[in-house]
Amino acid sequence: MKQSQPVLTIVVPCFNEEEVFQETSHQLTEVVDDLIEEKLIAEDSKILFVDDGSKDRTWALIAMESIRNKKVTGLKLACNVGHQKALLAGLHKAKNRSDCVISIDADLQDDISVIRDFMLKYHEGCEIVYGVRRSRKTDTFFKRTTALGFYRLMNKLGIKLIYNHADFRLMNKRSLEELERYPEANLFLRGIVPMIGFKSAEVLYDRKERFAGKTKYPLKKMLSFAFNGITSFSVAPIRFFTLLGFVLFFLSAVAGIGAFIQKLLGHTNAGWASLIISIWFLGGLQLMGIGIIGEYIGTIFSEVKRRPKYAIDIDLYNEQLSPLQRQEKERLEKKYS
């Protein structure tokens, strides 16, 4: 059991979350207050909201809340970079001022009451704690089925994932330092974090309905996320098409020998239907194979450019404000104090 009280930062990526922000901030503040009262975390623990280039009033709400509530702070990214990179920005920022960091989405679907269980596991010596959904009853049939298929496929491809785990997890400082050593531009944290190793534990919870607003992960984003996960961690799809190519070559050779023998025996068939079907079949396979190779080439292209993953516009966490931003904060403080 750890004796000292660790500094905890809860990192919450946000994109157009004005409908749910106030409730999320309120509930997380209550959790932090309870943990401080139980002496499970230090009094200077924080809730860090990361605004991922929102188009609504999300950042204004974060800035105002940081004035009213000293446990709340914010990080504003210069533009929308996506959930994974926004989350990584928060983790990087929180690492230097925290003993442990918990990441959670802003929609309140993850059960915040188990954050206490996360901290108990941390005090027992766990360096990474995964929040695992007990069931997916709140998901639609389509999402539940596709998610199950995705996890099974990833396991078949040899990719180590925590089943029914998203990005609700605790990481201590040492594991966050290890995470910084992974330079991937195409982030798939659900695959990267288990690779770090270290002592870990799982905490089960029941996933709730979204408190308000609409999901920020439509089908298009989910498919892109899945493809990114596969191409970032496995070359099995390319090997599959290589093997399929050898099999089709063998079958075509057998068919060619058979046709030659029939020709020698004087048996000839027009075979237009079979010819057209085989051409379309092989053409489709070739296009699929080219598409998969293209995905890998695109992934390589993104990686070799080594572009920064995000740019920070305003950092309330470290008070790195320009004179104009400082004036705006002072104006808000006068207005809401």
UniProtKB/Swiss-Prot annotation:
Protein species of origin: Bacillus subtilis (strain 168)
The UniProt record lists the keyword Transmembrane helix: yes
Record-level GO cellular component terms: plasma membrane
Higher taxonomy: Bacteria, Bacillati, Bacillota, Bacilli, Bacillales
Subcellular location: Cell membrane
Assigned keywords, A-Z: Cell membrane, Glycosyltransferase, Membrane, Transferase, Transmembrane, Transmembrane helix
Transmembrane regions: 241-261, 273-293
A molecular-function term among this protein's GO annotations: glycosyltransferase activity
Membrane-related topology note: Multi-pass membrane protein
Main location (coarse class): membrane
Signal peptide start and end residues: none
E.C. numbers: 2.4.-.-
Protein name: Uncharacterized glycosyltransferase YkoT
